[in-house]
Amino acid sequence: MIVVSEIADLKTIISEWKQNQETIGFCPTMGTLHDGHMDLVKTSKGQCTKTIVSIFINPTQFNDPKDFDAYPKNTESDLKLCEEHGVDLVFLPSVEVIYPKSQTPIQMSIPSLQTTLCGRTRPGHFEGVLQIVSKLFHLTEPNYGFFGLKDYQQYRIISAMVEELNFPIKILGVPTKRESDGLAMSSRNLRLSPKDRETASLIPRMFQLAKKTLLGGEKNLIVWKEILTDFLLTGSNVKIDYLEIVDPITLQPLSNLNGELLLATAVFVGEVRLIDNEVLVSP
């Protein structure tokens, strides 16, 4: 496995791979890797001849400096995990390499996809995501980009950017990897106290309740949302950032329970913000 931190070294390797007609898969991460990230790697290795993982905690997508400072860093174990799973190259740049002071900052946005869900409560977050992902796409020149569907809004926004700006990249969403109790895998789970970790299991149980009530014939969106909200709030130390029912493509709020829908939530359990979602079908 190759580990590089400089753009020039990365470009040299990419150039060689392109000359050899390798198919390149790219998995951008912020480190503290877990089995969910490794599912991205496995999917890439099944699709591509070379797999790149980037590890970069991007400061421009944090609207809360405390959140950035608290973000866990485990570079040594991350590299070991990548090597064990057959990653070909890890790009491990510094902030100075990605955002040199000589550059003029550019801001990107897709307003129609950023006004709901996390975009409503985290101003500037997706501008930062689009900025770093577009940079990394240009640097790694992949044929495929792999993104976890736990961050569904991010997946949709990046897919739209690639389509709108004609990036020669195919974006693939990888299903959410879950813990044994159904909680979506996330580096943030490490910050939960034992009691809060138990409380967090309300989130996957809420999705089970959502399916059960839909199959039971619930058709009133307002009533359905109230049922799910009340269930989440049975947990101590829980604060709901949002619980929304939106169109899976446009991410705009729905007014009724007909056909395919995206149920998405962000919940604070203690000080830790957890997100999850599921695409459901109302019969």
Swiss-Prot record:
Cited function: Catalyzes the condensation of pantoate with beta-alanine in an ATP-dependent reaction via a pantoyl-adenylate intermediate.
Binding-site list for (R)-pantoate: Q61, Q154
MF terms (GO), sorted A to Z: ATP binding; pantoate-beta-alanine ligase activity
CDD domains xrefs: PanC
UniProt xrefs under Gene3D superfamilies: HUPs, Pantoate-beta-alanine ligase, C-terminal domain
GO biological process: pantothenate biosynthetic process
High-level lineage: Bacteria, Pseudomonadati, Spirochaetota, Spirochaetia, Leptospirales
Pathway note: Cofactor biosynthesis; (R)-pantothenate biosynthesis; (R)-pantothenate from (R)-pantoate and beta-alanine: step 1/1
Protein name: Pantothenate synthetase
Binding annotation for ATP: 30-37, 148-151, 185-188
Pfam families the UniProt entry points to: Pantoate_ligase
Enzyme Commission (EC) number: 6.3.2.1
Family under the similarity heading: Belongs to the pantothenate synthetase family.
Quaternary structure note: Homodimer.
InterPro entries, per database record: Pantoate_ligase, Pantoate_ligase_C, Rossmann-like_a/b/a_fold
Active site: H37
Catalysis performed (reactions): (R)-pantoate + beta-alanine + ATP = (R)-pantothenate + AMP + diphosphate + H(+)
Main location: cytoplasm
